[in-house]
Amino acid sequence: MSRYRGPRLRIIRRLRNLPGLTNKLVESKKNKVSGSDQSIQKKVSQYCIRLEAKQRLRFNYGLTERQLLNYVRIARCAKGSTGQILLQLLEMRLDNILFRLGVVPTIPSARQLINHRHILVNNRIVDVPSFHCKPKDIITIGAPKTYQSILSKRIESFAKDQVPEHLTLSLSEPKKPKGLVNYLINRESIGLTINELLVVEYYSRKA
């Protein structure tokens, strides 16, 4: 299954707000239940609950079905909680790190910068959005002139205290902001409201 490129509002109306996909907020359709519909509401199956959790994770981080399945398999082979390791793997992707630093509004926009070779990790160009960042990695945003004004406005509007503790944003060079990965992210700093155990359960027969 390919990566979703359709209307984003349609997704967040169905799956609720996904900060990585879009910064727009809408009321979920599930919260808009008319009086006549309340009497005919069906009990949601456990499969549907797990499927929704999986879809929230996939769309928020902009993954294909195969990519997410591969991450689940990697998490299963690692020591520790499979669900937490899965979230850690997704959060430490380069495209998500840029998003969490606040230099881009969404993960898709971070992916665009990376694909155009404007991002350096430890002074080397990295053009792979799924690149796994590690503690002590230094990310430099070498944005083109056409994007610098947008970048400066974005950074001004993004409060520095919104940057999670596992990351540090340096603005000593406004035209080339830098990010530092302090340590691996912990569960409390995950930017998405999600029950990762439901995702692991969904893939229990596939991974």
From Swiss-Prot:
Part of the 30S ribosomal subunit. Contacts protein S5. The interaction surface between S4 and S5 is involved in control of translational fidelity. HAMAP family: Ribosomal_uS4_B. It is found in: Plastid, Chloroplast. One of its GO terms (cellular component) is small ribosomal subunit. It comes from the Eukaryota. InterPro entries: Ribosomal_uS4 (IPR022801), Ribosomal_uS4_bac-type (IPR005709), Ribosomal_uS4_CS (IPR018079), Ribosomal_uS4_N (IPR001912), S4_RNA-bd (IPR002942), S4_RNA-bd_sf (IPR036986). GO terms for biological process: ribosomal small subunit biogenesis; translation. Coiled coil: none annotated. Belongs to the universal ribosomal protein uS4 family. The lineage of its organism: Eukaryota, Viridiplantae, Streptophyta, Embryophyta, Tracheophyta. PROSITE patterns: RIBOSOMAL_S4, S4. This is Small ribosomal subunit protein uS4c. Keywords: Chloroplast, Plastid, Ribonucleoprotein, Ribosomal protein, RNA-binding, rRNA-binding. One of the primary rRNA binding proteins, it binds directly to 16S rRNA where it nucleates assembly of the body of the 30S subunit. GO terms for molecular function: rRNA binding; structural constituent of ribosome. SMART domains: Ribosomal_S4, S4. Its main location: plastid.
